[in-house]
Amino acid sequence: MTITPQEALQRTIEHREIFHDEMLHLMRLIMRGDMSPVMAAAIITGLRVKKETIGEIAAAATVMREFAHHVEVPDNSNFVDIVGTGGDGAHTFNISTASMFVTAAAGAKVAKHGNRGVSSKSGSADVLEALGVNIDLQPDQVAASIAETGMGFMFAPNHHPAMKNIAAVRRELGVRTIFNILGPLTNPAGAPNQLMGVFHADLVGIQVRVMQRLGAQHVLVVYGKDGMDEVSLGAATLVGELRDGQVHEYEIHPEDFGLQMVSNRTLKVENADESRVMLLGALDNQPGVAREIVTLNAGTALYAANVAASIADGIQLAREAIASGKARAKVDELVRFTQQFKR
């Protein structure tokens, strides 16, 4: 059964759910550019006001995946995405990007899906460019990068070209909509495991259940109670874990892993170059908060990737990857590999 955009808008005004097949239809209209900007703006605003349901988000993510340019990775064992929704307003250096190098050095395969900074001073694409990585790769080149280096960066605009049909609407609205939470749900390489940071506590339970509906294997959705979309050193972290089809929600604390609780204030950066310096300092094993938070997040990602049996074991593997110099070497490896495709 199809639904007209006008009927969908009325549904949101009445705070009623848009059903799965209806949401698929509406989202396809948006992604094809077949819905007027006025109606698209009204519907995504209406969804935000009534609060998007797990079913609506899962359907929207399904369509975004349909329209994506996919990266084919034949072996998805120990294959993980480390990603945040962004929008936490913390302006920290790129913790998840730093964690990618450590996680790959410790034996996982990482498909990092990211973009330039919008709410942050430095998005993952910005800091990778500052490091010398060529982010403008075709899907087959990203697949080769994962096979060769254990890491691949998927620059979102290259993989989600249909998003251009809603870009102007989103820009003009200037408020968060369903599209702000779809990015981490739509990894073009289809990584079955994920460490996903979110910008609000309510999203922990929502996003992990969306991933459950989308057929993911092992996912940890995290929210630092100090407002970070990462596993935090400055507060407890809420975790929603999907494993073996079951969801469990719990809290973790830095002290659980022998880490000191410290403020994340020292992790703030003003631009991509400052982020690059802090990232390299952490990977060069310089003692401090940056190294510790990367170790904590990479350890959690190694658990999500099923390389480690627990977060604690993952942290130990992450420490070894940094101390041995293997994590730092991964930066140079990715730079070298991606530069051969420079156009």
UniProtKB/Swiss-Prot annotation:
Binding-site residues for Mg(2+) 1, renumbered to this chain: S96, E230
EC number in record: 2.4.2.18
Cofactor note: Binds 2 magnesium ions per monomer.
Gene3D superfamilies: Nucleoside phosphorylase/phosphoribosyltransferase catalytic domain, Transferase, Pyrimidine Nucleoside Phosphorylase, Chain C
Assembly behavior: Homodimer.
Record-linked Pfam families: Glycos_trans_3N, Glycos_transf_3
UniProt keyword Kinase, yes or no: no
Species, as recorded: Burkholderia vietnamiensis (strain G4 / LMG 22486)
Ligand binding (anthranilate 1): G84, N115
Entry binding sites for 5-phospho-alpha-D-ribose 1-diphosphate: 84, 87-88, 92, 94-97, 112-120, 124
UniProt function note: Catalyzes the transfer of the phosphoribosyl group of 5-phosphorylribose-1-pyrophosphate (PRPP) to anthranilate to yield N-(5'-phosphoribosyl)-anthranilate (PRA).
A cellular component term, taken from the record's GO annotations: cytosol
Name of the molecule in the record: Anthranilate phosphoribosyltransferase
Gene Ontology biological-process entries: L-tryptophan biosynthetic process
